[in-house]
Amino acid sequence: MDQVMQFVEPSRQFVKDSIRLVKRCTKPDRKEFQKIAMATAIGFAIMGFIGFFVKLIHIPINNIIVGS
């Protein structure tokens, strides 16, 4: 019985701590959500532009190398 409790007790403690964490968490309000969404969108746009310019630079370089 001790061996069974040795495996069950950490799981029980984890579930108890997880439930406590979820109860303490709160949903972001509308203003906070919009701020996070805007920051994420700006990040995506910046990464897209960086990828576009890298591709734009590598196309002529690739044509020079392959065209030779």
Swiss-Prot record:
PANTHER family: SEC61 GAMMA SUBUNIT. This is Protein transport protein Sec61 subunit gamma. Its main location: endoplasmic reticulum. Keywords: Endoplasmic reticulum, Membrane, Protein transport, Translocation, Transmembrane, Transmembrane helix, Transport. Residues 62-68 are extracellular. Pfam families: SecE. The chain crosses the membrane at residues 33-61. It is found in: Endoplasmic reticulum membrane. Signal peptide: none annotated. The lineage of its organism: Eukaryota, Metazoa, Chordata, Craniata, Vertebrata. The SEC61 channel-forming translocon complex consists of channel-forming core components SEC61A1, SEC61B and SEC61G and different auxiliary components such as SEC62 and SEC63. The SEC61 channel associates with the multi-pass translocon (MPT) complex. The gene is sec61g. Component of SEC61 channel-forming translocon complex that mediates transport of signal peptide-containing precursor polypeptides across the endoplasmic reticulum (ER). Forms a ribosome receptor and a gated pore in the ER membrane, both functions required for cotranslational translocation of nascent polypeptides. Residues 1-32 are cytoplasmic.
